[in-house]
C-alpha cells in the first residue's frame, strides 16, 4: 500500500501525467501465473541464480513475492481511484493557498479512504489464500494456512481437522469480504476524469525506471537462465514427453470453462453478494469440496475452475450492465425487437466486457496449479501441474521451457482478445 498506493497519490499531488508504458509494465505481475513468478525468483535469486541473495525458502522470500504482486496492484487500483477525483477540487484548494500536505489531507484522502480500505482488503485476501508462493518459496519456515490445509487434505487425509481449519479460514475471509464488499465498486476501473498535466518530472521518471526494473528483473533472470542452461536435448525431451498432450488438454478445458462462464454470467442476473460468496472460498477449499462430492476427475476440475472464474466475471458483467441505462433494452422491446434481437443487442453492448472475461478466465485456468493438481486425473495432467512436476523433479531446463510455452499461450490469448477491439 505504501509503495504502490503512495506512488499513485504522489503522482497526483505533483500533477504527473499517466505514462502508458509504465501502466502496462505494472500490469504484468497481475497476469503472471504464480508458478512463473516462483520459478523466476528461483532462477534469479536462488543459490544457482544470477543474483544469489540466499533469501529463498524463507519468510523473506514469501513476503517479497507478495510485494511483487501487490505493489503493482495497489498502484493500479489507487491510480484509477485518484483519476476519478476532479482536478478542479485540487485547483480550488491550491488557489486558496493550500500546500501539498493540506491538499492531501483535505481533498484527496477524504475521497480515497474507501478505495484504500478496499485495496487493502483485496491484498489481504490474496496473501491469505495464496498457495503456490509460500509452498515453493517458503519451505517449512514460510508455510501458511493454505499450505497446511492442502497437506492435511491430500497428504495426510485428516479430513476432520482440515474441515475445521477450512471453516475457520472461510469465516475470516467472509468477514473481510463483508467489510470491504461495499468498497468493491469504488476500486473498480471505470470512467475517469481526464488529467491535463504537463511533462513528467525527472524524479518520477527515475522512480518509474526503478519500479519497472524491479518488475522485469525476475522475468529477465528467468529468460536468461533458460537461454544459458537449456539445451537441444531439453527441447527434444519436452517434445517427446506428455507436455504437448497436457497443453492440448489445458486449451480444451480452458475453452469449455470460458464458454460456461460467459454463458452463466450473461444469462443469469447475479449480484455482488453471489460473487462475494464465491470469493470467500480459497482454491484449496474449492478443490476439497469438489473432491469430496465427485472425487478426482474432469467433472470436479471443471466445476472447481468455474467457481474461481465466476466471481470476477460476475463483478465485471454487473459493472458493465450498470454503464448503460436499463430503459435502453426496454425501448428496444417496445419498438418491436424480438427476444433474439434484444439478446444480440446486449451482446453487442457487453462485447468489451466479454473479452475481458475471456482474458481473465483464460489466465486463471491456464495458470492454475492448485486446483488442477488436486483434481486432474494423475495419468492426464494439465500443462501447469505437469511443468511444476518437471521443475520439482530437478529437470529445471525442461520445466522452464514448459513454463515458457505456457506463458506464450497466455500472451497469445491476451493479444488475440484485445486485438479484436473495433
Positions of predicted regions on the chain:
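Glycine-rich helix-loop "coupling/hinge" segments at transmembrane-helix boundaries
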Residues: 132-157, 369-396
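Membrane-water interface segments at the C-terminal ends of transmembrane alpha-helices
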Residues: 1-83, 111-138, 164-181, 201-228, ...
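Short, charged juxtamembrane terminal tails flanking transmembrane helices
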Residues: 95, 418-422
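Glycine/proline-centered hinge or cleavage motifs at structural transition points of membrane proteins
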Residues: 96-98, 110, 335-337
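Short hydrophobic faces within alpha-helices
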Residues: 28, 91-94, 162, 319, ...
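Short glycine/proline-centered loop/turn elements that form peptide/ligand docking sites
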Residues: 85-89, 195, 324-328
Amino acid at each position: 500500500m505504501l509503495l504502490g498506493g503512495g506512488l499513485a497519490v504522489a503522482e497526483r499531488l505533483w500533477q504527473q501525467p499517466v505514462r502508458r508504458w509504465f501502466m502496462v509494465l505494472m500490469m504484468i505481475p497481475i497476469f503472471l501465473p504464480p508458478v512463473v513468478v516462483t520459478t523466476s525468483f528461483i532462477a534469479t535469486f536462488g543459490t544457482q541464480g544470477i543474483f544469489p541473495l540466499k533469501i529463498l525458502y524463507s519468510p523473506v522470500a514469501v513476503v517479497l513475492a507478495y510485494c511483487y504482486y501487490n505493489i503493482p496492484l495497489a498502484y493500479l487500483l489507487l491510480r484509477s481511484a485518484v483519476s476519478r477525483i476532479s482536478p478542479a477540487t485540487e485547483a480550488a484548494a491550491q488557489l486558496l493557498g493550500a500546500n501539498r500536505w493540506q491538499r492531501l489531507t483535505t481533498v484527496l484522502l477524504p475521497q480515497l479512504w474507501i478505495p484504500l480500505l478496499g485495496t487493502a482488503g483485496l491484498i489481504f485476501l490474496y496473501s491469505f489464500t495464496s498457495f503456490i508462493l509460500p509452498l515453493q518459496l517458503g519451505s517449512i519456515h514460510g508455510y501458511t494456512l493454505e499450505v497446511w490445509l492442502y497437506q492435511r487434505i491430500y497428504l495426510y487425509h485428516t479430513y476432520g481437522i482440515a474441515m475445521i481449519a477450512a471453516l475457520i479460514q472461510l469465516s475470516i475471509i467472509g468477514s473481510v469480504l463483508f467489510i470491504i464488499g461495499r468498497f468493491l465498486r469504488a476500486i473498480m476501473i471505470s470512467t475517469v476524469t481526464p488529467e491535463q498535466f504537463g511533462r513528467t518530472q525527472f524524479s518520477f521518471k527515475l522512480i518509474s525506471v526503478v519500479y519497472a526494473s524491479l518488475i522485469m528483473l525476475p522475468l529477465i533472470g528467468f529468460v536468461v537462465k533458460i537461454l544459458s542452461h537449456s539445451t537441444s536435448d531439453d527441447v527434444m525431451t519436452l517434445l517427446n514427453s506428455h507436455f504437448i498432450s497436457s497443453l492440448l488438454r489445458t486449451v480444451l478445458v480452458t475453452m469449455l470453462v470460458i464458454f460456461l462462464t460467459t454463458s452463466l454470467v450473461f444469462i443469469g442476473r447475479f449480484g455482488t453478494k453471489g460473487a462475494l460468496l464465491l470469493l470467500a472460498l480459497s482454491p484449496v477449499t474449492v478443490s476439497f469440496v469438489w473432491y469430496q462430492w465427485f472425487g478426482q476427475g474432469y467433472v470436479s476440475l471443471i466445476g472447481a475452475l468455474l467457481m474461481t472464474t465466476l466471481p470476477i466475471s460476475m463483478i465485471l458483467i454487473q459493472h458493465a450492465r450498470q454503464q448503460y441505462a436499463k430503459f435502453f433494452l426496454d425501448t428496444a422491446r417496445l419498438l418491436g425487437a424480438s427476444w433474439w434481437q434484444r439478446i444480440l443487442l446486449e451482446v453487442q453492448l457487453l462485447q468489451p466486457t466479454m473479452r475481458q472475461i475471456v482474458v481473465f478466465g483464460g489466465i486463471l485456468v491456464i495458470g492454475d496449479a492448485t486446483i488442477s493438481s488436486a483434481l486432474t486425473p494423475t495419468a492426464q495432467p494439465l500443462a501447469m501441474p505437469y511443468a511444476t512436476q518437471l521443475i520439482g523433479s530437478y529437470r529445471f531446463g525442461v520445466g522452464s521451457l514448459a513454463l515458457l510455452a505456457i506463458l506464450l499461450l497466455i500472451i497469445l490469448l491476451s493479444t488475440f482478445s484485445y486485438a479484436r477491439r473495433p
